[in-house]
Amino acid sequence: RGGMLISPRHFRELCSPSYREIASVARDCGVPMAAVDSDGNTMELIPLLVECGVNALFPFEVKPGNDLFALRRRFPEFVLMGWLEKETLNEGNESAIRGELTAKVPGLLASGRYFPNGDHGIQPLATFPSLCRFLTLLHELTGNPEGEFPRTPPG
């Protein structure tokens, strides 16, 4: 979780050729985003991916120390996805959920190229009411008019 499993030199030697090829094929096919899924602290990995033409990463786990505000300053064109601490859903504390979302979502949305999402999948400890609070606030912060959860079917 603390960083890369291989050195940047070995990444360039062993991984970069494949990432370059995949990103190139994606661009040639008109796909605007070449994304990678990687766990742990990915701060050192991002510059290497950018060298390869990869322009997106997810889920940006919180606990290992990723900082999307720092990454946004350094890589303004890179697509960022995630970075909302999944543990806030497990705890179900409305003020913790509000704090997590309001501290991150507005600033990152304003910077562009950000998809707000959890820093991993929803865990079994998350309750339905907690998830509804999270989604309602997320919709409020993103200006989505579909707004409130749970939704009930019309009629």
Predicted regions and their residues:
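Active-site loop segments of alpha/beta catalytic cores
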Residues: 1-155
